[in-house]
Curated annotation (Swiss-Prot):
The keyword S-adenosyl-L-methionine applies. This is Ribosomal RNA small subunit methyltransferase G. Its EC number is 2.1.1.170. Specifically methylates the N7 position of guanine in position 527 of 16S rRNA. Disulfide bonds: none annotated. Keywords: Cytoplasm, Methyltransferase, rRNA processing, S-adenosyl-L-methionine, Transferase. Its main location: cytoplasm. It is an enzyme of class 2 (transferase). Belongs to the methyltransferase superfamily. RNA methyltransferase RsmG family. One of its GO terms (molecular function) is rRNA (guanine-N7-)-methyltransferase activity. It holds the Pfam family GidB. The gene is rsmG.
Amino acid sequence: MKAKLVSLLAQANIKISDQQIQQLINLVNLLNKWNKAYNLTSVRDPQEMLVKHILDSLVVSPYLQGDRFIDVGTGPGLPGLPLAIINPSKQFVLLDSLGKRISFIRNAIRELRLTNVTPVLSRVEEYQPEDKFDGVLSRAFASLKDMTDWCHHLPKENGYFYALKGIYQEDEINELNKKYTIQKVIELSVPELIGERHLIVLR
């Protein structure tokens, strides 16, 4: 698995330490183990997890501005855990409303010895953070409007929303509240992943 991950990282031009590579492999092994009992993801093959979960999360990293982020509807910690592993100086809150997902994340934090991740079991609309965030991340929302409607109280005044999407649908922008504007639409290149991936940055 290590050779495969090293190859994928090279193709994506992502440079990380050997320790971080090992943490990412350990994360996939943990996810695979827990998945058999708790059904955390529909992706069953660890090699496929490297592409669809790890690399798909990591390619967002160069575009993150700031130090404090929340991953809303994180599921089994995606993209939050991979991003936290390769950005140890940034802080990540991982929020989900399902207990088994947060239990997995707590276990992963312990096993991987991550000091920059805080798991939160809550519905997003009920979560009131003491401090707002530089960035609100999510792979979970069906539309940009849903994301901004549900998470409007989370970013700082100059913070950003980062929506990880498949195909970029321009009609989603027309549905947005007029107070939000699209800052960037970035076409992401994920090695060995079939299909389009986009990062939409708005505030």
